[in-house]
Amino acid sequence: PYYHVVFTVPEELNSIIYSNQKLLYDALYHAASATLNELAKDAKYLGANIGYICILHTWGSAMNYHPHIHTIVLGGGLDDENKWKETGGKFFLPYGVISKVFRGKYLDELKSLWNDSKLKFHGTAEKYQNSYRFKELLDKCYEKNWVTYCKETFNGAQSVINYLGKYTHRIAISN
């Protein structure tokens, strides 16, 4: 089986992400990948190296700015001896754990970029140039529950190809 996992950041970060699209879209990919890899390798969840595909979306269903990562996760992986390890037919990572680990990894990368003075602040993000305001924003984001959507959606390679084609080869408003 294949699983569909969506990693979303709180809307409070949208203005900073919009001002730093390359850096913070990369951070989305890094945090999502690191979360999946770390948790899948943990023996209490799967104890294997998994395969997945990540797709960045920058808009939501209401045509609003809504950066998030869709992932297609293979239902199993290779253990340390390169033997296939099944997930047992259900998604193998707890949703709450995925959300908390992803939140930590994304905000850690955001803090590192801030500390290295790599972030730019335009428009409504200008207020976060102030270190106090930036820390307030981070605190607010750490306090929020980040929701990660997970479900089994795909049966077979053709379903995955159809899904990817639908979302990777269109714009926000299409026929």
Predicted regions: what they are:
Residues 1-175:
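Beta->alpha loop/short-helix hinge microenvironment recognizer with preference
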